[in-house]
Amino acid sequence: MTTTEPRTEREILDRDSVDDVDAIAEFNPDPVEIIHAVEDQAEALFTWDYSKGSRPRLDKLYEKAKVSQWNAQTDLDWSIEVDPLEAFSIFTESSNVNTGHWTEHPDSPAKNWGDKEWDQFSIESFAWRLSQFKHGEQGALLCTAKIVETVPWIDAKYYAATQVVDEARHVEVFEKYIDEKIGVRYPVNPHLQLLLDDIINDSRWDMTYLGMQIMVEGLALAAFGMMHQVTTEPLLKKLLRYVMSDEARHVAFGVLSLQEVYQDMTAKEVRERQEFAFEAGIRMRDRLLQQEVWDRMGCDVKKAVEHGLNIPDDDQIFNQLLFSKIVPNCRKLGLLDAGDGWLREKYTEIGVIELEHLEDTGEEYSTFSIEDEQLATDRS
């Protein structure tokens, strides 16, 4: 949908304010639906220009993707035993959920918890995280298939086709880990679902790129990086390393493609992309509040959300770092300061603008790549 005037925050988010607790506290209990349908407004485009390599950086990504494929069933050692509590409690500690703001504050829903409750929370929280990643990867699977259909460049179609395979593998590997090693699963968070629906529903192919390749995949890459850094569980560590090597290419695909597209856009068109980047950032912030976990732990979800929104700045580091790929990439694309710098102002308000000078993913993907020799060694 295009607009003639810049929209207000209320119009962008369809709620009273950025921190509307009632809206943010919405959560998805055990799911009823098995199939979720979203209308896809886009046209499928053929191109008769088959000139491979006319966009060299995309062609380089395509060639890299072809030799970087791995098998979720055979390239990971699924015989490794996993103790959920030992493996996952470190993520609760690293995300500052068990700090004084949650353990001692009089308004905290967890103020009376003992070790038993915190142990259960660690397992539930990690199961929720991996479940949301799995749902997000299915969203990426659908969105990338849409990019194959809608992008007008043959080099982009070629690369996007490899990403479809990557995303199928990611859904597969997260489901297998959840099923075999955790045994606890969660439905899709409504804030994530709303964002995925918006991305798929939009008719403009570059919005699919922005929503999925830059925003959703950018947050996932940052999250996987932090999880890989802190985990000592060997199966999860290797799984995340493989997934990160794919995700870095995916985000780079978005950056390299959109750089070209945005150069020729009008100020009005760029503002619409800024608004979407802001909306996506808020939706992802909202989904990080683990509404379904608090519900399963028997807490008042609205009170938990309200308490989570009031975390002191010093304890916000984990959530802020999840934007460590998004903000630099928006800067690289020129979205932060385009027009009157509206997106910079909004990212300042939600406390993530200081991440803008971290490395963007346009070329960074090479630092995450798994070389052919490493794959061969892993398989020997």
Regions inferred by a protein language model and the residue ranges of each:
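Short amphipathic alpha-helical segments with heptad-repeat character
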Residues: 131-134, 138, 161-164, 168, ...
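Helix-loop elements that line ligand-binding/catalytic pockets
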Residues: 239, 251-261, 278
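A structural signal for well-ordered alpha-helices, especially hydrophobic packing surfaces
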Residues: 141, 171, 175-178, 251, ...
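Active-site-proximal alpha-helical scaffolds that flank and shape metal-associated catalytic sites
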Residues: 176-248, 272-283
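A structural feature that tracks compact, well-ordered secondary-structure segments
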Residues: 143-147, 161-162, 221-227, 239-242, ...
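Terminal targeting/low-complexity segments that flank the catalytic cores of oxidoreductases
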Residues: 1-143, 149-157, 180-187, 191, ...
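Amphipathic, well-ordered alpha-helical segments in soluble domains
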Residues: 136-143, 170, 216-223, 250
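Carboxylate/His-rich catalytic cores and anion/metal-binding grooves
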Residues: 153-183
